[in-house]
A protein has these predicted regions:
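Short glycine-/aliphatic-rich beta-strand segments at the starts of folded cytosolic domains
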Residues: 2-15, 101-104
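Short amphipathic alpha-helix segments
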Residues: 15-30, 112-114
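Short, charge-patterned binding micro-sites
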Residues: 35-54, 73-88
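Short beta-strand-to-loop capping motifs
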Residues: 46-51, 105-107, 139
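Short, conserved charged micro-motifs
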Residues: 52-57, 111-115
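Helix-adjacent hinge/juxtasegments
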Residues: 58-109
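Non-DNA-binding regulatory cores of transcription-related proteins
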Residues: 112-126
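Conserved small/polar residues in nucleotide/adenosyl-binding loops
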Residues: 142-144
Length: 144
């Protein structure tokens, strides 16, 4: 079995798309995954699965929509992939405050057209870089 981090997007933000973590754990366990654990109310889950990541994503998304009645995009990473993201640290030379260092995850490489649109935005003092399926972002100031 492989240990995965399963990241659910857009749940438990405000009043829409609420999912109780106990219900989420119960669903994923019923789907055949082992060692299912959640982090706070974030929708971040770790679990063990025999399925490859490419099968796990649509399987979990379908189960969530069936059980809760709304679509939930899911991103999956193995422990090793997450460790590699941390080790890579492409903005480490400018990112001096970890609370303002963000990594956004995607299931596929960030498309060229998205990268072109990002390049057209003036980030002021913010810095970002795209590396495969990750967008690393350093927020120099909290913009109000």
């Amino acid at each position: 079995m492989t240990r995965y981090a399963v990241l659910l997007r857009g749940i438990n933000v405000g009043r829409a798309h609420r999912i109780a973590m106990a219900d989420l754990r119960e669903l994923l366990t019923a789907e055949g995954h082992a060692g299912v654990a959640t982090l706070l109310q974030s929708g971040n889950v770790v679990l063990d699965s025999d399925r490859p990541a490419g099968e796990l994503v649509p399987s979990v998304e379908q189960a969530l929509e069936w059980r809760f009645g709304f679509a939930v995009p899911v991103v999956v990473r193995t422990r090793e992939e997450l460790l590699a993201v941390v080790a890579k640290d492409p903005l480490g030379s400018v990112a001096t405050d970890p609370s303002r260092y963000v990594v956004s995850f995607s299931n596929a490489p960030v498309p060229a057209e998205v990268q072109e649109r990002l390049a057209a935005v003036d980030p002021e003092d913010d810095v970002y870089t795209v590396d495969g399926r990750e967008l690393y972002l350093w927020l120099s100031l909290i913009h109000i």
